């Protein structure tokens, strides 16, 4: 063996070591910093099990937590910028599993928040990542996936066929929505079943209860009154856990017009029209269909997320190329830091979900509530909330790109299958909400027991997806 041949493996190792060790050392340093700082901040903390209890951190303890979060974020950013390719997402992959994982995370948030029992999971799902909920992510990502799929599809088919496919899917979802609304109502008629969790909605701000199935008892009359059939067909009644489905059906119905605009390269016109409709509803609330979903998800407002997601999916390749440039990387770093800042803002929310919850008190309660009402309300999609959604999606996508292999091993096995069947999960979770509400002990205030209940629902849902239970009936 020649000297040069013998030196090659050594040279490879010498070149390889700094590329691999730097991010590892940064990660270990960040983890140690975060653990130490959080321990210092939470020293002497024990969970409060009183109703509405929890822990609020003031002064130094609160800033220590912020410092730990900042250190961890900066370490992840630096590691992502200087790390090797061995753990990054393989750009040659045909299907973008990063989107599947994020969609899986979003639908898990939706499931846990709709099955509203106080558990440890809620410490992560109730705006812990910023003033964002799973619903916004669900709508935006649905648009992104549709944009990606139909840009490819239109390379091998015409607009007429694409329109037919979109309307066929909208029709299938509409029929599914009708069946779920009726099936839930019939299930509540079974002896011993308490259906209030799906037939009423309690406004937590004032304690007022609203009926979600007005006049539905007349459905059993003969003949059935016309106004009852009208309300059912227009999706003016049904479980609140399911009402966003009506929004999605309407968005799919108008999607051919949106796709046609993108195909003609009228993206700027499309976005301007979308913002104009958003502005109209911000100035004066307009209910076009008087459907149930238009109260929590006003159509003219929430279309903005779907349209921008659609455009991002359509121009995905161009956006990714831009993100790889120096300016693009700088923009991603700013997005990550901005998302962290909004998460810290959200941690100042004075409302505690259960006795294990921890909040910061860096902002006076009145100041936080004023800012939240002005910029971050969910139904009206305040400008701050829209910014938070955009920054969080960019940040999570960048994180998954830089650390794909370890995150895929840790979370992907569970979240990716759910993300590939989000509509299926969304349908079945409504029935799980009814079941959980009728299990003795759940929802009674025992956080650990409720955590087990949430875990059981997630596990059963995952198994149903893996076993493809009723996949031929329920859309995915």
Question: What is the predicted role of each segment?
Answer:
Residues 3, 7-476:
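Alpha-helical transmembrane segments and their immediate juxtamembrane cytosolic regions
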């Amino acid at each position: 063996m020649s000297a040069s041949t013998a030196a090659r493996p050594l040279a490879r190792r010498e070149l390889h070591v700094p590329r691999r060790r730097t991010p590892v050392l940064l990660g270990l340093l960040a983890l140690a910093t975060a653990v130490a700082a959080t321990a210092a901040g939470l020293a002497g903390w024990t969970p409060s099990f009183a109703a509405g209890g929890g822990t609020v951190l003031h002064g130094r303890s609160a800033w220590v937590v912020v410092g730990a979060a900042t250190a961890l974020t900066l370490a992840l950013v630096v590691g992502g910028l200087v790390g090797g390719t061995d753990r990054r997402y393989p750009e040659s992959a045909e299907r973008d599993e990063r989107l599947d994982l994020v969609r899986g995370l979003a639908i898990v948030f939706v499931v846990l928040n709709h099955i509203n029992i106080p558990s440890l999971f809620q410490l992560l799902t109730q705006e812990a990542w910023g003033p964002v909920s799973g619903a916004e992510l669900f709508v935006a990502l649905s648009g992104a996936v549709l944009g990606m799929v139909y840009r490819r599809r239109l390379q091998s088919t015409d607009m007429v066929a694409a329109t037919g496919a979109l309307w066929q899917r909208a029709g299938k979802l509409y029929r599914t929505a009708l069946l779920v609304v009726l099936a839930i109502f019939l299930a509540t008629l079974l002896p011993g079943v308490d259906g209030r969790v799906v037939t009423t909605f309690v406004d937590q701000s004032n304690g007022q209860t609203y009926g979600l199935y007005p006049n539905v008892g007349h459905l059993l009359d003969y003949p059935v009154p016309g106004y009852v059939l009208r309300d059912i067909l227009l999706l003016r009644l049904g479980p609140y856990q399911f009402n966003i489905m009506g929004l999605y059906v309407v968005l799919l119905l108008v999607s051919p017009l949106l796709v046609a605009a993108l195909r003609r390269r009228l993206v700027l016109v499309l976005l301007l029209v979308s913002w104009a409709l958003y502005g109209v509803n911000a100035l004066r609330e307009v209910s076009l269909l008087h459907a149930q979903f238009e109260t929590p998800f006003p159509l003219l407002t929430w279309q903005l997320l779907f349209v921008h997601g659609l455009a991002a999916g359509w121009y995905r390749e161009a956006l990714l190329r831009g993100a790889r440039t120096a300016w693009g990387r700088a923009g991603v770093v700013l997005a990550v830091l901005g998302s962290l800042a909004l998460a810290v803002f959200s941690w100042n929310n004075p409302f505690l979900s259960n006795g294990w919850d921890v909040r910061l008190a860096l902002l006076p309660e009145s100041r936080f509530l004023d800012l939240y009402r002005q910029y971050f309300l969910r139904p009206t999609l305040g400008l701050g909330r829209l910014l938070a959604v955009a920054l969080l999606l960019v940040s999570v996508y960048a994180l998954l790109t830089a650390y794909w292999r370890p995150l895929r091993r840790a979370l992907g096995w569970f979240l990716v299958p759910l993300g590939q069947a989000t509509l299926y999960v969304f349908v079945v979770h409504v029935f799980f909400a009814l079941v959980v509400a009728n299990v003795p002990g759940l929802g009674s205030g025992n956080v650990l027991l409720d955590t087990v209940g949430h875990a059981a629902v997630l596990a059963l849902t995952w198994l149903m997806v893996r076993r493809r239970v009723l996949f031929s009936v329920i859309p995915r």
